[in-house]
Amino acid sequence: MILVIGLGNPGKEYQYTRHNIGFIAIEKIANQYNSSFSTKKQFNCEIAETISDGQKIIFIKPTTYMNLSGKSVISVKTYYNINPAKIFVIHDDIDLETCRIKFKTGGGNGGHNGLKSIDGVIGNNYNRIRVGVGRPKNNQDVADYLLNNFLQSEYEIAMQAIDRIVNNFDLILENKLEKFKNKIV
């Protein structure tokens, strides 16, 4: 069993923001497995479940705001008794240019409030799929930048990155993490 978490903020006003790239990605991945989300209030998230090649996959989108994402992660992790090594978090990263993706296990949170929240409840020994959204230009405030919609040209480039994750996601299910890491760059 694996748990895949897409980070973002709830609400239509945030749907296409840079900070919601995790939600955008997880929706496309779940769709690939013909799995749809439903709200589970007891877990503070939207959840979708499927089985692929005998392995259960649980997808979640926290319904809390980003800085409280750990609340839903710990609820689902505890209920399903999931080892942190089987947890994959997809999130935005301003230290990577748009369209760049990096995969890593463990490590720091890079100042990302969603990761800080998750680290606070399960530690940091889980997998991260970091999706680049670039840095703000012209001294724009970081929070303002992340909570604004992608420019159309950026969105198209970001979707190319998401497609690389979706098209290679089976490698995660096969526990070929190094191969996944190399294919998504």
Curated annotation (Swiss-Prot):
CDD domains: PTH (cd00462). The keyword GTP-binding does not apply. One of its GO terms (biological process) is rescue of stalled ribosome. It is an enzyme of class 3 (hydrolase). Its main location: cytoplasm. TRNA binds at residues 14, 65, 67, 113. Keywords: Cytoplasm, Hydrolase, RNA-binding, tRNA-binding. One of its GO terms (molecular function) is tRNA binding. Belongs to the PTH family. This is Peptidyl-tRNA hydrolase. The lineage of its organism: Bacteria, Pseudomonadati, Pseudomonadota, Alphaproteobacteria, Rickettsiales.
